[in-house]
Design a protein with these regions (language model features):
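Helix-loop-helix hairpin linking two adjacent transmembrane segments in secondary transporters
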Residues: 141-184, 195
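C-terminal membrane-cytosol helix-exit motif in multi-pass small-molecule transporters
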Residues: 134, 173-196, 381-389
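Paired small-residue
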Residues: 90-93, 101-110, 299-307
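Conserved MFS/SLC helix-loop-helix module at the cytosolic interface between two early adjacent transmembrane helices
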Residues: 62-100
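12-transmembrane solute porter fold
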Residues: 10-26, 31-33, 42, 46-47, ...
Length: 399
């Protein structure tokens, strides 16, 4: 077997892209932990609180396709920096918000910035890697998101417990500045000409459609689970924000741990078998706790966190590789935006459905049906979608 050499510049771009993706992931999990304190401070219940997440993700989605076009036209570096500037302005407005409507408006501004930056993060991360090595690169990229899911809940819990929910928004500013510095230092300043055909052109490609569907389902399950678990632990189990943050952090540990190994396995075996196993594992974990009397907190809930993390982790790399390898590299910005849009639509739907599931309360009688619904989605939707993935023709892998 011929060894494919990856240039050093590719690894530098991977670091910058992964760091930017991690920042956007930290934002979602950090804010989720702070939501119960937001509710107490601004006198808002669990159902309207879900709009803090939902509005962010919806505006994020709206600006993803323009962001993808900018990446293909101007390059990842310029687009990432523009997105980070808008995102930081939204974080500052959120930290200073004096009412719930103002907080929602600030989250919309953050979503606009994230929508511009997200396609640059993924396209930039793999820009120097040949198709046959993208699984390994995306495994690392996925692991960075897993690490972000560890940092986000713990940082959010620590800051909220010590200083209140506003501290979580203030913390995003230095993190965004660090990400901008990495982008300037590590991502090449390249001009890229947009090739004919918009995002809709690539929707005709089977793996792009299937990968987008699988990516959306992954985030629906992940964000929905995080929201439900956080509300249950803080409102019913009596956990502090910091202690409650350990649950999504444990899930994130296993998401991150699964990433690099899954990436290498995907390069060797393809996306389909890994995606099938991933949805099966995640569905089994959710069904175990949704359909039985298994404890939802304490050490008895550890198997749920492990199974959910190991199930969702490989899907970060698998869905991205399947879609990116189905199109030429000059279209990576637009296809990255489609993937991100699917993920964010899934996340928004997950947060919204979770808020509806808990409208009668955040106790076990409401949490278990929500987990069961997540399991059903993994099995009934996830497995068929994964089964339809196929290796892309060689011509589509050209860069």
């Amino acid at each position: 077997m011929t060894t494919v050499v990856v240039p050093r510049s590719a690894w530098r771009s991977l670091i910058a892209g992964s760091g930017l993706a991690a920042l956007l992931q930290i934002d979602g999990t950090l804010v989720t932990v702070a939501l119960p304190d937001v509710g107490r401070s601004l006198t808002v219940g669990p159902q309207p609180l879900a709009w803090v997440i939902t509005v962010y993700f919806l505006t994020y989605v709206v600006f993803l396709l323009p962001g993808g076009r900018l990446v293909d036209r101007l390059g990842s570096r310029r687009t990432a920096l523009a997105g980070l500037a808008v995102f930081s302005a939204g974080a500052l407005a959120g930290a200073l918000a004096s009412s719930f409507p103002l907080l929602i408006a600030s989250r919309a501004l953050q979503g606009i910035g994230a929508g511009l930056a997200s396609p640059a993060a993924l396209a930039g991360a793999v820009s120097g890697f040949p198709p046959e090595r993208r699984g390994s690169a995306l495994g690392i990229w996925g692991a960075s998101s897993g690490a972000a899911n560890i940092v986000g809940p713990l940082l959010g819990g620590l800051l909220t417990s010590a200083f209140g929910w506003r501290a979580a928004w203030w913390a995003l500013l230095p993190l965004a500045a660090a990400s901008a510095a990495a982008v300037i230092r590590l991502l090449p300043a390249t001009e890229r000409a947009t090739a004919p055909g918009g995002a809709g052109t690539f929707l005709r490609r089977r793996n792009v459609v299937l990968a987008a569907a699988a990516a959306g389902l992954t985030f629906l399950v992940m964000i929905g689970s995080f929201f439900v678990i956080e509300q249950y632990l803080q409102r019913s189990a009596g956990y502090s924000p910091l202690l409650a943050a350990t649950a999504p952090a444990v899930i994130a540990v296993f998401i991150g741990a699964a990433g690099p190994t899954a990436g290498r396995l995907i390069d060797a075996r393809g996306e389909r078998p890994v995606a099938l196993m991933s949805f099966l594992i995640a569905g089994a974990g959710l069904a175990l706790y949704g359909l039985t009397g298994a404890p939802l907190h304490g050490f008895g809930a550890l198997p749920l966190a492990i199974l959910l993390g190991l199930g969702l982790g490989p899907l970060f790399a698998g869905t991205s590789r399947a879609a990116l390898n189905a199109v030429p590299q000059h279209a990576h910005g637009r296809v990255s935006s489609l993937l991100s849009a699917s993920r964010l639509l899934g996340a928004a739907l997950g947060a919204g459905l979770s808020g509806l599931a808990l409208r009668g309360g955040a106790d076990a009688t409401h949490v278990r049906p929500a987990l069961t619904f997540g399991a059903a989605l993994c099995i009934v939707v996830g497995l068929p979608v994964a089964a339809l993935l196929r290796p892309p023709p060689a011509a589509q892998e050209q860069i």
